[in-house]
Swiss-Prot record:
This is Peptide chain release factor 1. NCBIfam families: prfA, PRK00591.1. Keywords: Cytoplasm, Methylation, Protein biosynthesis. The modification N5-methylglutamine is found at Q228. Residues 280-304 are annotated as: Disordered. The keyword Protein biosynthesis applies. One of its GO terms (cellular component) is cytoplasm. The keyword Lyase does not apply. Its main location: cytoplasm. One of its GO terms (molecular function) is translation release factor activity, codon specific. Belongs to the prokaryotic/mitochondrial release factor family. It comes from Ruegeria sp. (strain TM1040) (Silicibacter sp.).
């Protein structure tokens, strides 16, 4: 049973926010509006749950009325059967939220072990995420891309913007392993390669303040696949954050735009480091994550000869690899979210 006093606190806060926005009082209206918007689905679940309890209590009272008893006996089993689902939906709505879930994300993909084949797999992963983003109505902007000679990727950094981007893609961080016969393999032997994926919530200006004295900014010529020069101006920008050693590059044609993009990616990486530090300190939070959260953790295997994808964190195996590589990721992501929610619910019940 969910404590009634907790539900009343949420409803009172919601009513306060509604009144504060109506009369323009209470501080930062934009901040109040966001909190109000975040609480709305919770309040809707509370209302549905409380209405069900009220209907059940009313039906049970009707049992004492001879004229209404038959109707009550018909309604009560239906209402009782609906109660567990309503309570579960409310519990999910009450789970602690990751404040970064609503943010855009920075996607980073880099080949691991496997040479040319790993670079080709990195390119396959980028296509997979790009196609998934397209199905979700998200916008993908490439920030940095280094192609290999065979058409793979030595590095890919992209910004993905849209509704719920980080909330759905954050479970993709980790080592992705592929088992297949490489195009360069004449003997038909299956090789194992890997690529590392990192999904970072985009930082906002209020998250990270950077001292200009902590930066070294270099300009250089932008280059494409194979090292050829894309243009003749020194437009590419490389920013080094001296305290951490983080290095960010951006190589669009506008040097001013490159500096803006590189600074945004740097802030995002610093923000991610801070989030990791806080997560490490919260041992209970670490226990509730799907997997260890370590980006060196092998999270998934893509076996092409068998047409199989296995996610090792939740023991999920699907035999529809072509669809998955084509961007059909909802079944995997939904399963990961459900597992994460189940662990949080278990912690709430302790």
């Amino acid at each position: 049973m969910i404590p009634e006093d907790r539900l009343q606190q949420i409803l009172q806060r919601y009513q306060y926010l509604e009144a504060a926005m109506a009369d323009g009082a209470g501080g930062d209206i934009a901040k109040l509006a966001k909190e109000y918007s975040d609480l709305r689905p919770v309040v809707e679940q509370i209302s549905a749950y409380q209405q069900l309890l009220s209907d059940l209590a009313e039906a049970e009272e009707m049992l004492a009325d001879p004229d209404m008893k038959a109707l009550a006996e018909e309604e009560i089993p239906t209402l009782k059967a609906a109660l567990p689902q309503a309570e579960h939906a409310l519990q999910l709505a009450l789970l602690p939220k990751d404040e970064a879930d609503s943010r855009a994300a920075i996607l980073e993909i880099r080949p691991g072990t496997g040479g040319d084949e790993a670079a080709l797999f990195a390119a396959d992963l980028y296509r997979m995420y790009s196609r998934y983003a397209e199905t979700q109505g998200w916008k993908v902007d490439v920030i940095e891309e280094q192609a290999s000679e065979l058409g793979g990727l030595k590095e890919l950094v992209a910004r993905i913007n849209g509704d719920g981007v980080f909330a759905r893609l954050k479970y993709e961080s980790g080592v992705h392993r592929v088992q297949r016969v490489p195009v360069t393999e004449s003997g038909g032997r299956i090789h194992t390669s890997a690529a590392t994926v990192a999904v970072l919530p985009e930082a906002e200006d209020v998250d990270i303040k950077i001292d200009a004295n902590d930066l070294r900014i270099d300009t250089m010529r932008a280059s494409g696949a194979g090292g050829q020069h894309v243009n003749t101006t020194d437009s590419a920008v490389r920013i080094t954050h001296l305290p951490t050693g983080l290095v960010v590059t951006s190589s669009e044609k506008s040097q001013h735009r490159n500096r803006e993009i590189a600074m945004q990616v740097l802030k995002t990486r610093l923000y991610d480091l801070e989030r990791q530090r806080i997560d490490t300190e919260r041992s209970a939070d670490r226990a509730s994550q799907v997997g260890s959260g370590d980006r060196s953790e092998r999270i998934r295997t893509y076996n092409f000869p068998q047409g199989r994808m296995s996610d090792h964190r939740i023991n999920l195996t699907l035999y529809k690899l072509d669809q998955i590589m084509g961007g059909d990721l909802d079944e995997i992501i939904d399963a990961l979210i459900s597992e994460h929610q189940a662990k949080l619910l278990a912690e709430m019940g302790q």
